Swiss-Prot record:
GTP binds at residues 26-33, 156-159, 211-213. The lineage of its organism: Eukaryota, Amoebozoa, Evosea, Archamoebae, Mastigamoebida. The modification Phosphothreonine is found at residues 57, 59. Catalyzes the GTP-dependent ribosomal translocation step during translation elongation. During this step, the ribosome changes from the pre-translocational (PRE) to the post-translocational (POST) state as the newly formed A-site-bound peptidyl-tRNA and P-site-bound deacylated tRNA move to the P and E sites, respectively. Catalyzes the coordinated movement of the two tRNA molecules, the mRNA and conformational changes in the ribosome. The modification Diphthamide is found at residue 697. GO terms for molecular function: GTP binding; GTPase activity; ribosome binding; translation elongation factor activity. This is Elongation factor 2. It comes from Entamoeba histolytica. Residues 17-251 form the tr-type G domain. Its main location: cytoplasm. It catalyses: GTP + H2O = GDP + phosphate + H(+). GO terms for cellular component: cytosol; ribonucleoprotein complex. It is an enzyme of class 3 (hydrolase). Its EC number is 3.6.5.-.
Length: 840
């Protein structure tokens, strides 16, 4: 297989049944980019020697320096299946176009994974066979299943089991089994009815084993072919015996289920005897330098070494031999082609999850059928910087229709509502580009089922959006598993450079799916990210790429808190409008546990049918059904984890002031009364309203501030407190380092929740909760206390209530409130109730 020209690529793009859109996902350092190299080698893009070392899809200098992937990178390649028996039934010919996206594994960049999953139909999940399924494996797999993306698995770093841990073959089998079982537990936990059962099993060919660094991999299919040809038996029968409790009794010449021979001798299971043993024997012969032994094995395997290769020894020779015998690229590409769906298959069950409009309209039908003649529907999931500073390719997937260079299209942002003109422009597409890792190639048009980059769209979209050619609903915006909770204020050393900073922040906001850039009312310029590393990368980009190297001053990182209440308002709160002609009576209640999380997870949404919503709230949280039907608003921003409920009866003119009251509620929830942080987990009941009969006296200018003040009064009478964000830290270390972990955790208000040894390894898995505000410098601190043996990975987990009185400056929560108020330039001390609560 050679590098394929753009012209040939176009022909493949039309053959929808033979396209595979897939991404590589895993925990950090489990070997995604290294494995991707094996696939890229097959496409003839890098040489065989460089595979596993080049990390071709790590295109940025900082990715090569840090040895981690920061941005997801797309590459298209072509593969032909040689064995006609293996071609899938719905395929059209034996040539396949594979659009692969390599994604980051570090939790701080998991928004990049979400963007990659949105435009793909399948995912290759990489699991380190020593470390097993880790916290980020769980996160990315959950995201994949939420997007209805079908997973297949590769158990990576198998060479470590043989060379480092020197495990017995049976132990290795049990270790692989545990990892596969853990993946299947996650798949069944987050399963989706429409996606169907996507559990993985080596016997079905959906699990491979290999080593990305050494460039080899195999599925059981490979050995089934080899042994069935040798013994002259049916390939499928052989395949069934290579996994599970199947033991070959050579004397009796039959398979047993119990591992004991007729005379009580211990039998080896099929996987060990026919798959793992040959590999282990070859490994040992080469590493121990037993030339006669391994040359005999190579002859049996029909592997011919070149004169140069014969000179090699040890690991170098091992790599060469294994790449020739079990090339990872071929194994993985076959697995991708055979077990991942084409756009034609996948879009049938993915459309209902993606399209926001009715499922029987023209756009939805075209998406479900992947119809290139239907209306254009494309989702832009991220922006990729071009060589032209400050400009971006809009990268996305065409779900129906065909997008053409120079064609007119409607570019709609995530807030577009059909029938309205906001957040939508009609413009020409300047160019369509094939994204090829480090390079791009212009192309005239791109039919549905493919991923593509667009030039000239970046001016009209911030981060993501939908591109159509007719009036249609938009494709649902992405939901990220992390939130930007760590932020810094940025300013320029030289005030005259301020316009460059503002422009740079706009560009940074575009380039990163998650990064938030905004200006506070106090005039501070804020950049917010998911964690310390994410923020560091964003700030480096901001200074070097988007602000032309302007010197910047960056404050210490600050963490976002949330305000809440801990008990119902002790009195009914009354606020009057400025003209004293209107009165609002409200009361606040804290959410029952779990409701805020349900709202954020989308279990109940503002657009859910009100009867369904009421049923859910009454059954799960014991709400009164009538009250649950009268939810006016979720806040802030009409979608947050707070609710405004109308419990009044028969109030005249109430509908006329509804918008103003909702507006006031949203304002109050966005900037809380305690320290201007967002409010979370509060339900506000509107209990009574007295309105002036004349509409001119109850306009927005009167009612919005009145509603806001009343909400604040309710919060102040409900024992207000703060919620701080907590990380779930997963730390892998040997037993000797556990003491150091406890020391660091206790110093940082952390709480260890579990520690367990990974069976068959000397490693311990320690899980702990760590406050985000205590996490700065945590990794360096931990490494210095454990002599560099502990590797932490922190994922945002939940919001934790801080105990104490917010008005008492000597308590922990009081001192945090005082510090936040001082930083924001607010008056000292929490405002008193008399500022918001009016007397009758």
């Amino acid at each position: 297989m050679s590098s394929t020209g753009v012209k040939t690529m176009k022909d493949f793009m039309l053959n929808k049944s033979n396209i595979r859109n897939m991404c590589v996902i895993a925990h950090v350092d489990h070997g995604k980019s290294t494995l991707t190299d094996s696939l890229v080698t097959l496409a003839g893009i890098i040489s065989n020697e460089k595979a596993g070392v080049a990390r071709y899809t790590d295109t940025r200098p900082d990715e090569q320096e840090r040895c981690i992937t920061i941005k997801s990178t797309s590459i298209s390649m072509y593969y032909e299946i040689e064995d006609k028996e293996d071609i899938p039934a719905d395929a059209n010919g034996n040539g396949f176009l594979i659009n692969l996206i390599d994604s980051p594994g570090h939790v701080d960049f998991s928004s990049e994974v979400t963007a990659a999953l949105r435009v793909t139909d399948g995912a290759l999940v990489v699991v380190d066979c020593v470390e097993g399924v880790c916290v980020q494996t769980e996160t990315v797999l959950r995201q994949a299943l939420t997007e209805r993306v079908k997973p297949i698995v590769i158990i990576n770093k198998v060479d470590r089991v043989i060379l480092e841990l020197k495990e017995e073959p049976e132990e290795a089998y049990q270790s692989f089994c545990r990892s596969i079982e853990n993946v299947n537990v996650l798949i069944s936990t987050y399963k989706d009815e429409l996606l169907g059962d996507v559990q993985v099993s080596p016997g079905e060919g959906t699990v491979a084993f290999g080593s990305g660094l050494h460039g080899w991999a195999f599925t059981l299919e490979k050995f089934a072919k080899m042994w069935s040809a040798k013994f002259g038996i049916d390939r499928k029968r052989m395949l069934e015996k290579l996994w599970g409790d199947n033991y070959w009794d050579a004397k009796a010449k039959k398979w047993k289920k119990n591992g004991k021979g007729d005379h009580g001798e211990v039998l080896q299971r099929g996987f060990v005897q026919f798959c793992f043993d040959p590999i282990t024997k070859l490994f040992n012969a080469i590493m121990e330098g037993r030339k006669a032994d391994y040359e005999k094995m190579l002859t049996n395997l029909q592997i011919k070494l070149s004169a140069d290769d014969k000179e090699k020894e040890g690991k170098e020779l091992l790599k060469t031999v294994m790449k020739l015998w079990l090339p990872a690229g071929v194994t993985l590409l076959e697995m991708i082609v055979l077990h991942l769906p084409s756009p034609v298959v996948a879009q049938k069950y993915r459309t209902s999850n993606l399209y926001t409009g009715p499922m029987d309209d023209e756009a939805a039908k075209a998406m479900a059928n992947c119809d290139e003649k239907g209306p254009l529907m494309m989702y832009v999931s991220k922006m990729i910087p071009t060589n032209d500073k400050g400009r971006f390719y809009a990268f996305g997937r065409v779900f129906s229709g065909t997008i053409r260079t120079g064609g007119k299209a409607r570019i709609c942002g995530p807030n577009y509502v059909p029938g309205k003109k906001d957040d939508c422009v009609i413009k020409n597409i300047q160019r369509t580009m094939l994204m090829m890792g480090r390079y791009t190639d212009p192309i005239d048009e791109c039919p549905c089922g493919n991923v593509i980059g667009l030039v000239g769209v970046d001016q009209y979209l911030l981060k993501s959006g939908t591109i159509t050619d007719s009036v249609a609903h938009i494709i649902k915006d992405m939901k990220f598993s992390v939130s930007p909770v760590v932020r810094v204020a940025v300013e320029t050393k030289n005030p005259s450079d301020l316009p460059k900073l503002v422009e740079g922040m706009k560009r940074l906001s575009r380039s990163d799916p998650l990064c938030l850039c905004y200006t506070e009312e106090s005039g501070e310029h804020i950049v917010a990210g998911a964690g310390e590393l994410h923020l560091e990368v964003c700030l480096k980009e901001l200074q070097e790429d988007y602000c032309s190297g302007v010197p910047l001053i960056v404050t210490e990182p600050v963490v976002s808190f949330r305000e809440t209440i801990t008990e119902p308002s002790r009195i009914q709160c009354l606020s009057k409008s400025a003209n004293n002609q209107n009165r609002l009576f409200m009361r606040a209640f804290p959410f029952p546990e779990g409701l805020a999380e349900d709202i954020e997870a989308g279990e109940i949404k503002p657009d859910t049918d009100f009867k369904e919503r009421a049923k859910f709230l009454s059954e799960k949280y014991g709400w009164d059904v009538d009250e649950a039907r009268k939810i006016w608003c979720f806040g802030p921003d009409n979608c947050g984890p707070n609710l405004f409920v109308d419990v009044t009866k028969g109030i005249q003119y109430l509908n006329e002031v509804k918008d103003s009251i909702v507006n006031g509620f949203n304002n109050a929830m966005h900037d809380g009364v305690v320290c201007n942080e967002q409010i979370r987990g509060v339900r506000i009941n509107l209990e009574d309203v007295k309105l002036h009969a004349d509409a001119i006296h109850r306009g927005g200018a009167q009612m919005i501030p009145c509603a806001r003040r009343c909400c604040f009064a309710c919060v102040l009478t409900g024992a207000p407190s703060l919620l701080e964000p907590m990380y779930l830290a997963e730390i892998q270390c040997p037993e000797s380092a556990i003491g150091g972990i406890y020391t660091v955790m206790s110093r940082r208000r952390g709480k260890i929740i579990s520690e367990e040894q990974r069976p068959g390894t000397p490693l311990f898995n320690v899980r702990a909760y760590l406050p985000v505000c205590e996490s700065f410098g945590f990794t360096a601190d931990l490494r210095s206390h454990t002599s560099g043996q502990a590797f932490p990975q922190c994922v945002f987990d939940h919001w934790q209530l801080l105990n104490g009185d917010v008005t008492d400056a000597t308590s922990k929560v009081g001192s945090i409130v005082a510090a936040i108020r001082k930083r924001k330039g607010l008056p000292e001390g929490v405002p008193g109730l008399d500022k918001f609560y009016d007397k009758l």
